[in-house]
Regions:
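ATP-dependent NMP and nucleoside kinases share a basic, alpha-helical "lid"
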Residues: 70-73, 79-138
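NTP-dependent small-molecule kinase module
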Residues: 133-139, 145-204
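P-loop (Walker A) phosphate-binding loop of NTP-binding proteins
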Residues: 8
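Hydrophobic anchor at the beta1->P-loop junction of P-loop NTPases
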Residues: 5
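Walker A (P-loop) ATP-phosphate-binding motif of ABC ATPase nucleotide-binding domains
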Residues: 2
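Conserved lysine of the Walker
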Residues: 13
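Hydrophobic positions on the alpha1 helix immediately C-terminal to the Walker A/P-loop
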Residues: 16, 20
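Conserved substrate/cofactor phosphate-moiety recognition/catalytic segment
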Residues: 22-67
Length: 204
């Protein structure tokens, strides 16, 4: 089973991908962050430059993950991905009209990506602003990230309505570092039960 986790910047995608991957013990494919990406990408995102190049870069990154998964997927497995074709489409909202046609051509990279579920995370801007400030990344300007989140989140909500296997989950009040938050996601997305590792009280 393949599950894509998508949403605007600062929503908690990377955390949820890692946490659910660990919970299911089947692996997860994140998009990474600073240190993984080409150093020019973050600067171009912050400055609103090179929209087609940025979009193509993330499309190629996601595509590498999907190609690698093909050799690891199997019946009974649940594999989580950060990002999907809908991600590339949602981010188009932050770029000018003159770039839209070129951006649409880049979308073709994601035509072969398939999922059993797409979890679309959304939340209030207050929650996102809190998470952005908590992660305290020096290369992120909180006000700009919140502005971008509003644009991208609105696009995700609209796009999700046309995806037959998308489930929109409002993450306000959900903590992805707590079992209760992860269980809420599993239930809302109708994912199969994860295997429990038994914990026992044992005498010395």
């Amino acid at each position: 089973m393949r599950v894509a986790i998508v949403g605007g910047p600062g929503i908690g995608k990377s955390t949820l991908v890692r946490q659910l991957g660990d919970l299911y013990h089947n692996g997860a494919y994140g998009e990474g962050e600073k240190g993984v990406w080409d150093p020019r990408v973050l600067d171009d995102i912050a400055q609103g430059r090179n929209p087609v190049g940025v979009t193509e870069y993330f499309a190629a990154l996601y595509d590498a993950n999907y190609r690698d998964c093909a050799s690891n997927d199997a019946p009974g497995k649940v594999i989580f991905f950060e990002g999907a074709r809908i991600t590339l489409e949602a981010h188009m909202a932050e770029y000018p009209a003159e770039c839209q046609e070129s951006l649409r051509r880049v979308l073709a990279i994601g035509d072969s990506w398939t999922f059993d579920r797409i979890i679309v995370l959304t939340s209030s801007t207050a929650t996102v602003e809190k998470h952005i400030k908590l992660r305290n990344r020096p290369y992120e300007v909180a006000e700009n990230m919140v502005r971008r989140f509003r644009l991208i989140d609105a696009a995700f909500r609209q796009l999700a309505s046309r995806e037959h296997n998308a489930i929109v989950i409002d993450r306000d009040g959900m903590e992805f570092h707590e079992r209760s938050g992860l269980d809420a996601i599993v239930q809302a997305a109708a994912l199969p039960k994860y295997p429990e590792i038994p914990y026992r009280d044992l005498a010395c």
